Amino acid sequence: MVLLSKFDFSGNKAGEVELPDAFFVQEGNGLQLVKDYLVAIRANKRQWSACTRNRSEVSHSTKKPFKQKGTGNARQGCLASPQFRGGGVVFGPKPKFDQHVRINRKEKRAAIRLLLSQKIQTNRLIVADDSVFTSSLASPKTKEALRFLKSCNVECRGILFIDDLDHAQNNEGLRLSLRNLSAVRGFTYGMNINGYDLASARNVVISEKALKGLAGHLISGTKD
């Protein structure tokens, strides 16, 4: 078991959270696994639909624009040639085969678990008591949210907040308070976590319930 301290809205220690040792078990080549997962996320965001028309596909008459000789101009075959306005494109992009990258569910869970464990080992993950997300701010106050970050010694840079989906109706005060802070990278929910956001975030603030639910999900192997 690994014990992590959790903090209340005042930055005081409010107890500890237990994480099983299985959460930190590395499967195979961890760095390669994370790389493959992040490459898959970026590749699958692309549309792969860029398409241009060549000279045989554009809508133009095949009639010669002017006679072959006597004008002093270079001879031209038709207005579909690429040198004319509205002509075909030479070597333009075409839709390729489906280049979406598939990553197994087991590999995805292992990559996210490794990213979270690295944040824990480098002291860049702060566990907040559930009350911080649900009842700490009845109305949005950016100053109070910033005070919470400073009291927990969170570096105000690239912060990702993660909450449990069950708190979605009660965390509006905190979400709106964080919206105006440039140091906050995003606000997401445990089961919807994106590995790319997690990897690019410098610090993570996660609620106790979200951490327990996410740890159980990543270890047990339940379907996404």
From Swiss-Prot:
Region of interest called Disordered, as start-end residue ranges on this chain: 54-74
Stored InterPro entries: Ribosomal_uL4, Ribosomal_uL4-like, Ribosomal_uL4_dom_sf
Transmembrane stretches, start-end: none
CC annotations in GO: ribonucleoprotein complex; ribosome
GO biological process, one term: translation
Subunit structure: Part of the 50S ribosomal subunit.
Function: One of the primary rRNA binding proteins, this protein initially binds near the 5'-end of the 23S rRNA. It is important during the early stages of 50S assembly. It makes multiple contacts with different domains of the 23S rRNA in the assembled 50S subunit and ribosome. Forms part of the polypeptide exit tunnel.
Name this polypeptide is given: Large ribosomal subunit protein uL4
UniProt source species: Chlamydia caviae (strain ATCC VR-813 / DSM 19441 / 03DC25 / GPIC)
